[in-house]
Amino acid sequence: MPPSKARRKRSLRDITATVATGTVANSKPGSSSTNEGKQQDKKKEGPQEPDIPPLPPVVVNIVPRQGLGCEVVEGLLVPSRKREYKPNSKYTVGNHPIYAIGFNFIDMRYYDVFAIASCNSVIIYRCLENGGFGLLQNYVDEDKDESFYTLSWTIDQVDSSPLLVAAGSNRIIRVINCATEKLDKSLVGHGGSIHEIRTHASKPSLIISASKDESIRLWNVHTGICILVFAGAGGHRHDVLSVDFHPTEVGIFASCGMDNTVKIWSMKEFWIYVEKSYSWTGHPSKFPTRNIQFPVLTAAVHSDYVDCTRWLGDFILSKSVKNAVLLWEPKPDKRRPGEGSVDVLQKYPVPKCSLWFMKFSCDFYSNQMAIGNNKGEIYVWEVQSSPPVLIDRLCNQECKSPIRQTAVSFDGSTILGAADDGAIWRWDEVDPAASSSKPDQAAAPAAGVGAGAGADADADA
């Protein structure tokens, strides 16, 4: 039997007290009674997606110098110093690898909040202006043998509370309500370890999960329903390691895995089941889950494990264990489902990056990409330029452990690295004041959230 709730090991209540109330998540100070009435009206009307700030469209116009179908444009390993970063702080969580780290881009009220997954713990921090980290909440799963590999932020569609979804080796997806500091629900269905979870940007109740059982599952976090399963004759033939929703095409996503392929899937013909999942009142096991066996396109762009993939407009970024990230354009054959061609456009070299399960990340606007390597270095690329431009190479003499995953802040002014030795490394832009792309402060949390004197976690320079 899975544990009924996640045990909260430690919490700074002077930091999280406001987070746990409806004041920050749902209302302005002093208007709780009004909002309570509104919430009751919403419940009567039925659940709907929360009104969250929309993601801007990613504008990409990359034209290789050699032209399509010709030699791939490869970036030079010469830092341009367009943005210079300095190592700021180190925070050691323990001696276990940190497999996942991510900022909250779903809810702009918490744009400076990030979470990590290590061992059987999921820990939430805030990036402080002084360069340190503020510990907000720490959840420890009751299963001591659990090892979390992935996490993703989402939001409650009823009261807009921040939710954190995490999963790993024990095959169960945990949905944690960060406002109530309790486990909201557990999603069961996968037959193997879960390697990645992604949240739909415009429909945050929808998440997809990639598993060792060779399947991808689409879930409705609000109702706890497994809507669709993507596996079968045309599916992956080994562990699925990464997934990502298309930024503008609602029913499209990409997946990749140990079978060396990247697959593009469509759920448009089954969208009626997605809509049905929002109003389902029966037991989740009674929902008519559908299986999709054939992708729109299967691309053999790499010759080894593909452990990370992300959309860049209509293009795809994907990484294997061959010391590089590739940018390519998928061209599905509309007359022959599952077939088509690809044009590999650009190559972003990442020296000494031969380990698998090392993932890259981008800022909110997908302007820059950060990827770690085996030696504790992070390469920061200007991802939308052609030819690719290396912005900076981040290193620290003390950081020698592989960087499993990176997290780039909203505007790219802060870059975090999660290391194999249990350390979080932070680099900050030398002149962050020059950046003008931070989210509107009117959308930020009310004063006092994470701003208390006890918020500054001990950090080593």
UniProtKB/Swiss-Prot annotation:
Q: Where are the WD repeats?
A: 143-186, 189-229, 235-275, 301-338, 351-391, 398-437
Ranges annotated as biased composition (Polar residues): 18-37
- Keyword Nucleus annotated: yes
Task: Quote the InterPro entries the UniProt record gives.
Answer: PcG_WD-repeat, WD40/YVTN_repeat-like_dom_sf, WD40_repeat_CS, WD40_repeat_dom_sf, WD40_rpt
> Localized where?
Nucleus
Which of UniProt's keywords are assigned here?
Chromatin regulator, Developmental protein, Nucleus, Repeat, Repressor, Transcription, Transcription regulation, WD repeat
Task: Write out the tissue specificity statement of the associated record.
Answer: Specifically expressed in kernel starting from 6 days after pollination.
One annotated Gene Ontology cellular component of this protein: ESC/E(Z) complex
Biased segments, Low complexity type: 432-448
Task: Spell out the Basic residues composition-biased ranges.
Answer: 1-11
Q: Which family does it belong to?
A: Belongs to the WD repeat ESC family.
Its function, per the record, reads: Polycomb group (PcG) protein. PcG proteins act by forming multiprotein complexes, which are required to maintain the transcriptionally repressive state of homeotic genes throughout development. PcG proteins are not required to initiate repression, but to maintain it during later stages of development. They probably act via the methylation of histones, rendering chromatin heritably changed in its expressibility.
Report the protein name in the record. Answer: Polycomb group protein FIE1
What would be the name of the gene that encodes this protein?
Answer: FIE1
